């Protein structure tokens, strides 16, 4: 472990479960991100007074949804990191948009904590990692898979909808720890049947949709790679590299367990290659199951589809196509803008209170107790979640999990799974 790295003790490092040291590092991470988002490209090197604006803040610019608002230039008081924003190459004007588009309905601290845990609480490394992830999200247009329907995505990326129609991958139910379960039927994959970009976009689609199903306090997902019937014709090394990169660089700390189920003998030669690509954290989350009954060690029998021996849930995956008119709320620009303004108003308050929280106890403190400030941050985080999911149907296309008589994804952001036992 590198100098300055800190292991996350069990039961810590999560929203509401921070040690004093972890809280300080989270404050520093927030301070740096807000400093950059306010238009500064250099590291936070000074400790300005509370009455003075941070250096360069008078030149702050906004991008995306935040183009018309001036930055709150309240100074932040933390040590500097050594991150060169110019070298990373992210457009500072788009940073705030990337940040809040990524947070969705989660507690804002949750996102930053994922990157801090992934980099063992080294703020410089965590900040570099999250900025690179934001750059990827902007350059690869991750919002596209949320704002476009499956039919629109299929028209642009050959084979996108095919992944859903064949049931190559889908989400159903939760495991014993309450994590949503993503099933991947590897035998269905033939590299030539879709454009590589379509498979990447579908993977991101599953990631972004699956995030909606991770319900607090749960923070991770369970993946089942069903290797039944696998042959070398199904192997796609480029896709595996992309998936590994997603979990390690773009969606860190999102994987709870990855189960490789019933891998045939031919897979073990492939595994020796893949194993070398994995960082120790991801590798530690991989579990092998030899038969169907072993799956019940991970997933309760009542939640496990009965296609697996020991499973009691009479569930069979079936794709429900796009429903005509399901995204008509996109046309209601007036309501969308009103809800967007309400959501933005709350997040601006959250940022302002976060800056106050960063300074709590220091010479530039506001005078309110840290406990009082934290209570307001928590209240605002809850308001943000409510406001986001009111806005969601006006900016996110409805998907498979919004459809049907018993949809999984609810209007308030909760998930309801139906099991047929």
Predicted regions and their residues:
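Basic, amphipathic alpha-helical/coil surface patches used to engage anionic, phosphate-bearing ligands
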Residues: 1-421
């Amino acid at each position: 472990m590198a100098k300055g790295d800190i292991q996350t003790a069990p039961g810590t490092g999560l929203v509401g479960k921070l040690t004093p040291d972890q809280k300080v590092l989270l404050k520093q991470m927030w301070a740096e991100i807000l400093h950059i988002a306010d238009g500064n490209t250099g590291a936070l090197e000074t400790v300005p007074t509370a009455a003075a604006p941070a250096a360069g803040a008078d030149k702050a610019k906004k991008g995306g949804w935040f183009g018309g608002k001036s930055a709150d230039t309240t100074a932040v008081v933390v040590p500097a990191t050594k991150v060169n924003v110019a070298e990373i190459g992210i457009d500072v004007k788009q940073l705030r948009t990337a940040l809040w588009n990524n947070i969705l309905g989660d507690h804002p601290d949750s996102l930053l904590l994922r990157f801090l845990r992934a980099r063992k609480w080294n703020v410089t490394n965590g900040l570099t990692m999250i900025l690179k992830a934001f750059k990827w999200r902007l350059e690869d247009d991750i919002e596209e898979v949320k704002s476009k329907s499956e039919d629109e995505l299929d028209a642009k990326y050959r084979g996108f909808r095919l992944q859903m129609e064949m049931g190559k991958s889908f989400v159903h139910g939760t495991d014993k720890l309450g994590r949503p379960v993503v099933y991947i039927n590897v035998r269905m994959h033939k590299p030539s049947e879709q454009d590589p970009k379509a498979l990447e976009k579908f993977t991101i689609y599953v990631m972004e949709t699956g995030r909606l199903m991770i319900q607090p306090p749960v923070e991770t997902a369970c993946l089942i790679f069903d290797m039944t019937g696998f042959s070398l014709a199904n192997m796609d090394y480029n896709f595996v590299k992309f998936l590994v990169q997603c979990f390690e660089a773009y969606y860190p700390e999102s994987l709870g367990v990855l189960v490789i189920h019933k891998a045939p003998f031919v897979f073990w030669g492939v595994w020796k290659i893949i194993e070398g690509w994995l960082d120790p954290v991801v590798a530690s989350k991989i579990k092998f199951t030899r038969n169907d009954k072993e799956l019940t060690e991970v997933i309760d029998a009542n939640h496990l589809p009965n296609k697996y021996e020991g499973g009691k849930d009479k569930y069979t995956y079936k794709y429900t196509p796009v429903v005509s008119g399901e995204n008509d709320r996109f046309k209601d620009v007036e309501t969308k803008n009103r809800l967007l303004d309400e959501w933005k108003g709350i997040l601006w308050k959250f940022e302002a209170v976060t800056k106050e929280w960063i300074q709590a106890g220091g010479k530039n403190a506001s005078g309110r107790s840290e406990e009082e400030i934290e209570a307001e941050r928590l209240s605002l985080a809850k308001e943000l979640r409510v406001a986001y999911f009111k806005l969601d149907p006006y900016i996110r296309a409805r998907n498979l999990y919004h459809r049907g008589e018993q949809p999984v994804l609810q209007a308030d952001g909760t998930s309801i799974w139906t099991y047929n036992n």
